[in-house]
């Protein structure tokens, strides 16, 4: 399956602006942020809103993310260990998959905060990204959830004991083919959590897929 995270487009910086002057008529333009009146002229200042947003966590080099995870002693646990920690040590499983996947089946008691969500905005940059996904036949393109940390903070304090989970989970363990492991949504989420002050972060090795494969209990949420 083709995967696309972003498309670089030559949009001007948000600091650039066009100044249009008219001696007698008022100019109207979509996207006008502010207008300044100049003696004898009416001046419109149009500020570009199509600038690419700040670099998302997914685009930070995996080596850099992995180093921080190891430095903060983020440890991977298998599904049976995760279940034990959840039952005996008040660990919370944080499922970072899309909401629809979470509702279709998740570990009992797990909470959901999406690491990625459907693209919601309609700026020029977001339209370009939608077109890029559509080029590959993908009509439900996703973006990193800019409210991920705020949403987690609303549910879990910085002292909470968290096991981050996604579908297949990736790994920090080196292999012959992947000497630095392989990143995943849950490892990117774990990186953001420790970067923002969470102190007890674990990672579910094998992900929700392995949880179900091992025959561990799963809850579903039916749509109304």
Curated annotation (Swiss-Prot):
It is found in: Plastid, Chloroplast. Keywords: Chloroplast, Plastid, Transit peptide. Its main location: plastid. The keyword Plastid applies. Residues 1-48 form a transit peptide. The active site is at residue 166. This is Rhodanese-like domain-containing protein 14, chloroplastic. It comes from Arabidopsis thaliana (Mouse-ear cress). The keyword Transit peptide applies.
